[in-house]
Amino acid sequence: MKNLILTLLISCTFSLYVVAQKTKNVQYLAEYTFNVKPGTKKINMSCLIPQHIDNIQHVDTLIYNIPPNRVYKQNGDRMVEFVIDSIEGNFVLEIYANLKVISNDSSNKKPQAISKNQSVYLVAEKYLESDQDAIIQQAALLKKNSELKTVQSIYNFVRKSLKYSGYNPKDVGALQALEAGHGDCTEFADLFVALCRASDIPAKVIEGYMIGYNVAMSKHNWAEVYIPELGWRVVDPTSTSFNRLENAYVKLTSNRTNPAIQNFHYYAYKYWGDPIEVLESIKTKVVD
C-alpha cells in the first residue's frame, strides 16, 4: 500500500513526510432499512452522499434503488432527498457508488491564498469553541514559530491529552472534550480544529467513512488544516502518525452542522403517521 516516502523539506530543521499511494478504487454501499407500521403515511429522507473533490476523490457511479426526488448541493455538500408516500410495508433504500480515492499526497496540492469564504474556518461555532478562554489559553501554550510546527504541536497535544473512550452518539464539543480528557473521533477532531482556529490557523472538521470497515467502525471524523506551504492538508487526530496517513478516507462533508439533516450526522428523516425505525448499514471495500 505504501509505495514510496516523499520528503518535503519545509525548513532546514523540520521535515514533513507524506506517503504517496496509488489511487484506490472503492465500492460504497449505504443501506437504510425502514421498519414501518400500518399507519405510516409518508417518509422524507435526506442523506449526505459522496461527491467529486479535486485531489481527494472522484465519483464514477452513483445508483439508487429508489428514484430520488432531488439531488442537490447545499453549502458545499452533495445531498439526496427521497419522499416516499406509497408505503406497503418494510423496505430498504440503497445508495451505491464507485469512487476513486486519491492519495493524501502533498505533491498533489498547490499553495493558494485563503479565500473570503474559507475565512469561516477561522471563527468559533457550535462544538468548535475557539473563543473560549480555556481553548485560547491552551492554544497559546502550543504556539510555535511556524504554522506547520504549531499544527504538529496541537496534534501531539490532542493525542496525549484525550483518551479514546469509544463511540458516543452525543456531541459534546471541543471545550468539554478538553475539560473531560476523553472522547471519540468527533471530540478529537473538534478539539484539534478549535485549537487551530484559536491559533489563527484555518481548520475544519471532516465527516465521512474509513474504507474497509463495518458500520460500527466506518463512520469517522478527522480534520483538514490550511498550511501556507501546502494548502489544505488532511490530519487525523486519532491516527498514531501525523506525517503518514493511510489512503483510506471517503469524505462527505466539511460542515460541522447541517440544517438540511437537522444538524444530525450523515442523514435525517421525518415521518407522518405511525413512527418508524431506520437501521443503517455502510459497507466500503477496495476493488482491483
Predicted regions and their residues:
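Short intrinsically disordered coil segments
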Residues: T61-Y64, K109-Q118, P237-T240
